[in-house]
């Protein structure tokens, strides 16, 4: 009897650990509901088109963790209020089945948090999902930026921290903004030692941006948040629909 109880307790602890791990690795981060694009009702043509686009994406391989999809071909210009555009960009280490999983989590979260909105964006740790009635492909969405910072400040060797961080950022900026091809997915990661610590960092752009657009987007983040956050905090992440950046004094990516 006691052995059965121990086995049940062990299984419960294992399930708790698995669920906790999943929550940490793909936690909800933020959402934005766009009220300017109007709303749709349950069972409407817009909702049917949206569901169909999501189903279509579900059948894609998502080898590079990205798609920009619509229910119309060539993203034609139209005043049809039922056209749907969907962007899915998964984090560079979350592709294939991991990206599919994040898609379904994000779509469910978006429908709950922005119920009936034709335009909305939601961020999870492993992906960003945007639905829209307007074609946003290739645009830098400056209105979508937000930041999350580590509560701990840099307490010592501040000048060394700043210099090392800037060198690493420069390296990753160049890596993420090479010509996009099968060998480069607008995603760069790296690390550098700062005294006894290591800094881990990543930069990524949505693959609908051009190489120049990616550079402009990441440069905008660095310029806007540089002195106030990056030189003071032990870790910060800045996210948007178009590009993202993160650094921490602990590893946060999949190996």
Curated annotation (Swiss-Prot):
Q: Give a Pfam family name.
A: Stress-antifung
Q: Which GO terms describe its cellular component?
A: extracellular region
- Give the source's domain of life in one word: Eukaryota
Span of the signal peptide: 1-21
InterPro entries, per database record:
CRR_secretory_protein, GNK2, GNK2_sf
PROSITE patterns, alphabetized = GNK2 (PS51473)
Q: Where the protein is mainly located, per its record?
A: secreted
> What are the subcellular locations of this protein?
Secreted
User: Sorted alphabetically, which keywords does the UniProt record give?
Assistant: Repeat, Secreted, Signal
The Gnk2-homologous domain covers 28-136, 142-252
Q: Which family does it belong to?
A: Belongs to the cysteine-rich repeat secretory protein family.
Protein name in UniProt = Putative cysteine-rich repeat secretory protein 13
Gene that encodes it: CRRSP13
